[in-house]
């Protein structure tokens, strides 16, 4: 892969992919998927490839202004027999972007650390073999905090995963301390509450604490994503029939599909 040197957020990137000597050599049809980290959320998109020579392909893609990191994956074959080249063993075709001042964007350090730690963060099944050390994840997360600590409410779930790597998932004292600290230093959001509720409920097995946090969430955010999920699961558990149909119609009146799709927390 060539052509991408120091990509800038908001720019049109252009690259050349040489398949000679790799797993996709001599394939007549290739596709490309781009993984994008934008404002602390991941999404995927397709990139159109143009064949230049037998084993040489060219692609372009317009990055968004808030794209902090992206990764390319090249594919051939059908879903059930897919061959992939993403330079897995050597760290992937992964790039951080710079802003107009030459600085990394919010999420750049964090994305660089967590994306390359699939054993912990499982982002998009991009890597199958490559995996950085725990200490490296901590270093990049620390750098994100040094530069963009004010954004912690957006990536508190990832930050707490890093804490679990360092302190152990069962370290309740660390979780208690950080929950109190974040409550004091930030305007607490539903996402922060939900993150800690999940930690207490599933990792620490502290149902009482988890239930108390959930009660706060449902009271403060009666139409939030937690209430939406609870209502959905209640309807899902109902037997088939008129009552379930009525409740389902009521659900989509209260939570229109378009609003659910556009809710950033539905993508977490």
Residue ranges and their predicted role:
Residues 1-236, 241-268:
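Glycan-association/targeting regions that enable binding to alpha-glucans and other polysaccharides
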